[in-house]
Every structure is written in structure tokens, then in C-alpha cells.
Amino acid sequence: MADAWVAPDSRPEDAPRQPVATPRPAAPSGGPVLPVPLRPMTIPDLLDGSLRILKLAPRTVIGLAAVVSLPVQLFLGYLNRQAIEDANVAAAFDDAFSGNASTEATGGLGAGPVALGVVLDGLVLAIVAGGLAYLVAGWYAGTEHSLGAVIRVAFRRAAPLAVAWVLVHLAEAVFAIGLIVGALVPMTWFAVVSPAVVCEGIGPWRAVRRSGALTRRRFGAVLGTVLAVALVDALLGSALTGLAEVYVALGLPGAWVVTAAAGAAAGLVLTPFVAGVAVLLYLDLRVRHEGLDIELAANRRFAPAPA
């Protein structure tokens, strides 16, 4: 019986199949590689996309975080050095058996330093989010920005970013009176204030209103994103600073230096991660409510040809 006809250059049936590569999404016209396609995103898309921002531009992202975050972390470590040095296992046991538990022995830092740390960390996050918004928005528009350009934009918009942060946290404080959970409402409404300040070039008050307008129609989804980011941030933070906490508990010398270094190292990862989610969430909301993906595609399609 004659063999079945086989088309020229065809693959034999028993030939092994080669795996199909799945490249990362790239912007049209050979632009920068994107962390996630510009489309409606799920919470896993936002979390994974934020990590991909760090992978795609580690020098720029970590450089921005280092310039903004490292001085703050070292300052806070030095400010709290005595309380950190006193927070060790031996002191805790001595006070427990003597009945004289002190604030220093139990690692209490006092209300003042703690409040200052919260404010400075919040301002750092706002400024880093502004810088990342400029970087990532540029990618989706087909433009690559240098580390120097990102840092300049972040600090140029630092004043409105700081004022917007204060406005948001005043609202959170008002909502939290008598009910801690109430702070989640403004935290959700104003989750994309920093990206709005930089991407749209608007002032703090307009950015607060703009964020509220974008998030209000998807309150549940944005709240879920906020809670997911908080959970991941807490888990990663504990993992990254765990060794430093053990070092402090053992009462070894130079505990405040180790604590400051661990906090600074954790900030280089966690701050860009949280900021990156805020940036991608801002883009997601604009895609859903305003068709940002269609607008950018039309701009590229009908852009005038270069002379």
C-alpha cells in the first residue's frame, strides 16, 4: 500500500513539538516593554505588574527609592537608636521578673518618633509613587525616561504630592474617629492621588477630587486592592526585617545600625511595590472609565508622520 502524501517541508507527525515562547507584552511600534497590557486589570494583575515594574527597570526604580527613602530610614534609625539598643531579651526578662516594665526595655519608641516615622514614610511613598507614575505612564505612551528625569519630576512635584498626602490623611483621621475601620473609606477613595498629581499635572486638591471620582464607581474592587497590598506589604516587611529584629532581641552591639540598614533595604523593595500598584490602579481606572487604552491607540494610529 502506498504511503500517504505529505506536503513538502511539513513536520512529521512524530516530530517533537517545540515550546512556544511567551514574550512579555511590548508597546506597539517597538516601544518599551510593558509590565502588563493596558486593559482592565484584576488584583493579581496589579500585584504582579508592580513586581514586573521593578524587574523591567531595576536601576531606575531602586535608584529613585534609594534617593528618596534611604536618608529618611537612616535618620529614623539614628533618632530611635537608644530605644532600639535597649529593646533586648535580657532587659525584657529583667523587667518582667522585677515588675518594673519600662517603655525603653520593651522597645517603646514614644509617640513622637513613631508619629514622625509614619509621616516621613508616607511622604516617601507619595514621592516615589509620583516618580513611578512618570516612568510607567511614559512606557505606555511609548517613551523611556532616564533615572535622572524620573528623580527630577518626583522632586519637582514633591510639594503638591506632600500637600495631597496631608489632605488624604486628615480625611482618614476624621473618618477614623470612633471607628478605626472608617479610615478605609478615604484610603480607598484617595488611593490614586499621587499618580494623578504627576500624570495630569494638577494640584493637590484637584488630585484628591480626581482620585475620588475615579475610585468611587469601583469602591469594592479598589478596597480589595488596598487590603491585598497592605497584606502583602506586611508579610514582605516581616520577612525582610525579621533577621534585624532577632539581632535586636539578642542585645548585640550596633542594633540601631542593623535596624536602620534592614529598614532601608526593605524600603527599596516595598516602597516601589506599593507605589507601583497605585500607578497601575490609576491606569486601570482610566481604562475602565475613560477608555485610556483606546485613546492612546488612536493617538499612535493617527500620529503625524515625522518630517
Q: Where is each model-derived feature located?
A:
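Hydrophobic alpha-helical membrane segments
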Residues: 1-307
